[in-house]
Amino acid sequence: MKSIVSVLTLLLLINAVAALRFVLPAKDKNELPFCVRDFVKNGELVVVTVESPKYADGQQLSVVVRDAHGNEYTRIKNVLGREITTFSSHQDTALDVCFHNVANSHQDLGKTKEIDLSVAIGANARDWEQIQASEKLKPAEVQLRKIEEIVDEVDKEMNYLKMREIRLRDTNESTNRRVKFFSVGITLALIALGVWQIIYLRSYFRSKHII
């Protein structure tokens, strides 16, 4: 029984919601944004929650969520309070949540804004309270349902890593074959060049009656 509980606890830890609290200084609008990266699979549900102080303090915080392929999921200007964005990923990719804290004036440069960010992916992104109410599930049934989805996600992740390893191995083997053929070609070319030089020098020396 203890081993089962340990496994379930491990699964919950692996699929924990990514939560961060950090302080972002106000900068010029031309400065590069600060980005937090996570990884999502194709069709996976994602809930991004950003929270910052509601009061105006000479800083304007904007948030952009996009993936490594350039797909933009949301763009929020002047975040005040809590902003929640829900979407499904278009493909297996890295997901960037980028923050740009711009000072309204030169005097506001150097001010800071405290930001809370949470990124829930897959089973953790679902509203389990709503599911429990709509399907009239018991708390234990909700936990089992959640664990079942997490196990399925872990299985998909393992299959993805396996396929990725196969692709990388095939690429490595293909590269090794090309390097080997290139090395053989260079060696044959050097041998041919050496033979040609010997023949040429022999012919030259004979024409000069040296040999």
Swiss-Prot record:
Side Cytoplasmic, residues: 202-211
Name of a matching Pfam family: EMP24_GP25L
Domain of life of the source: Eukaryota
Subcellular location: Endoplasmic reticulum membrane; Golgi apparatus membrane
Principal place of residence: endoplasmic reticulum
Record function comment: Constituent of COPII-coated endoplasmic reticulum-derived transport vesicles. Required for efficient transport of a subset of secretory proteins to the Golgi. Facilitates retrograde transport from the Golgi to the endoplasmic reticulum.
Name of this chain's protein: Endoplasmic reticulum vesicle protein 25
Annotated source species: Yarrowia lipolytica (strain CLIB 122 / E 150)
